């Protein structure tokens, strides 16, 4: 038994300079796991609750001392002496003790930090890398793959202070033979994009996720400058590199219409916005669109899935919020064909693994994702490999909070070699 002997919670700082929760779980034998909770900017209304103090005199109300107190108090007391290898049991104790549907008593930030720290401590006690322990928890021991990265090289929406409505314009180096080469390709395009933007007199400051955040004439112009950068880097768009977008459409959904500032404040219906996106997919090799409509617009999503679902990957983020109850309903209604996995949306490792399994069993793809507020914690890299999810979204080629995940993936690929293939385009729904 890997008995838990000490649990520590503390307040640390995330990549936006806001506080977040870090937890340590100590086991008999000196094994320690440490993990931090990330934090989102464009959040789904049905996400598990991130507990903030609300004391305006401290961190502008964003302090997390209440969540930290939950870790050091009731959570620690409840799991001391328990077996860290029983991840589902540890998570259940915390969830039951919290006693709310959305973890609002202790905060998903408290429960998740402990959940992940526990998994890391258990992995250490078994002498396993975290990805191998996760594969065992997932019921798929030894089954690994390296994920195709979605690299967010132009940031808009809630992630940047610019006039671009669509939140993320991403490249996927699908033609790479390995993850390491995919990272190289992404890096080269990123640097060529800076040159393209500078040549047009545009800003090369970066947004929350490390992508450039220029003001552009339209949303389509973001795709045009990326296409130029891909060509300048010596790659073929559509063959070596495909494109993906995160609309985060809930952020510009007003009174039943999609209002795009970058398109002259034009208001679109669900059907019109679906066809606006469809036109972009005809002009550019966009193979994945995330949150193409508002999280509550299920009727619109059914239409969008009918129009685009057999051609491209339609990813639900705010739509599904990593929640199996909501995902189950989406699967039954034929809504989207992929889920974005953010473990702080649901608040525990066990529930995250359940969402990935449900998606895969239904023929949906699962894209492992960071949040816009991140730390140096690279657990999502191990999660992507350990579940053989196939795709990962972890930002651009700048900011250490993003690059930490790519570097961890490079290390894992080196360790696993041929045991963890990089499957490229085949991982993306509709592209096999």
From Swiss-Prot:
Annotated localization: Cytoplasm; Secreted; Cell surface
Pfam family for this entry, one: Enolase_C
InterPro entries: Enolase, Enolase-like_C_sf, Enolase-like_N, Enolase_C, Enolase_CS, Enolase_N
UniProt binding sites for Mg(2+): 246, 290, 317
Membrane-spanning segments: none
EC number: 4.2.1.11
Catalytic reaction annotation: (2R)-2-phosphoglycerate = phosphoenolpyruvate + H2O
Function: Catalyzes the reversible conversion of 2-phosphoglycerate (2-PG) into phosphoenolpyruvate (PEP). It is essential for the degradation of carbohydrates via glycolysis.
Protein's recorded name: Enolase
Organism: Klebsiella pneumoniae subsp. pneumoniae (strain ATCC 700721 / MGH 78578)
């Amino acid at each position: 038994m890997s008995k838990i002997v000490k649990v520590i919670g503390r307040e640390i700082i995330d990549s936006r300079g806001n506080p977040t929760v870090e937890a340590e779980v100590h086991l008999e034998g000196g094994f320690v796991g440490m993990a931090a909770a990330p934090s989102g900017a464009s959040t789904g209304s049905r996400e598990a609750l991130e507990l903030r103090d609300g004391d305006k005199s401290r961190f502008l109300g964003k302090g997390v001392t209440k969540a930290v107190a939950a870790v050091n108090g009731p959570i620690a007391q409840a799991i001391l002496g328990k077996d860290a290898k029983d991840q589902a049991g540890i998570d259940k104790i915390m969830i039951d003790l919290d006693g709310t549907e959305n973890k609002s008593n202790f905060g998903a930030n408290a429960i998740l930090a402990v959940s992940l720290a526990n998994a890391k401590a258990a992995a250490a006690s078994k002498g396993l890398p975290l990805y191998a322990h996760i594969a065992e928890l997932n019921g798929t021991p030894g089954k690994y793959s390296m994920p195709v990265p979605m690299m967010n090289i132009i940031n808009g929406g809630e992630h940047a202070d610019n006039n671009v409505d669509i939140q993320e314009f991403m490249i996927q180096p699908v033609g790479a033979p390995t993850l390491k080469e995919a990272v190289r390709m992404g890096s080269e395009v990123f640097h060529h994009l800076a040159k393209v933007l500078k040549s047009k007199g545009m800003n090369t400051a970066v947004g929350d996720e490390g992508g450039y955040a220029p003001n552009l004439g339209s949303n389509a112009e973001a795709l045009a400058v990326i296409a130029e950068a891909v060509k300048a880097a010596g790659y073929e768009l559509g063959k070596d590199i495909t494109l993906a977008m995160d609309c985060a459409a809930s952020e510009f959904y007003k009174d039943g219409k999609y209002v795009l500032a970058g398109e002259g404040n034009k208001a679109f219906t669900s059907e019109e916005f679906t066809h606006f996106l469809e036109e972009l997919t005809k002009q550019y090799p966009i193979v994945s669109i995330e949150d193409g409509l508002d999280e509550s617009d299920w009727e619109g999503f059914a239409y969008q899935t009918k129009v685009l679902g057999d051609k491209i990957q339609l990813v639900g983020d705010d739509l599904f919020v990593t929640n199996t109850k909501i995902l189950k309903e989406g699967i039954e209604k034929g809504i989207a064909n992929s889920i974005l996995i953010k473990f702080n949306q649901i608040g525990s490792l066990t529930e995250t693994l359940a969402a990935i399994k449900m998606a895969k069993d239904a023929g949906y793809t699962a894209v492992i994702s960071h949040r816009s507020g991140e730390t140096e914690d690279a657990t999502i890299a191990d999660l992507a490999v350990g579940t053989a999810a196939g795709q990962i979204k972890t930002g651009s080629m700048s900011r250490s909070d993003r690059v930490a995940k790519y570097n961890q993936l490079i290390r894992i690929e080196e360790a696993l070699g041929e045991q963890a293939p990089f499957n490229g385009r085949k991982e993306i729904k509709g592209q096999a």
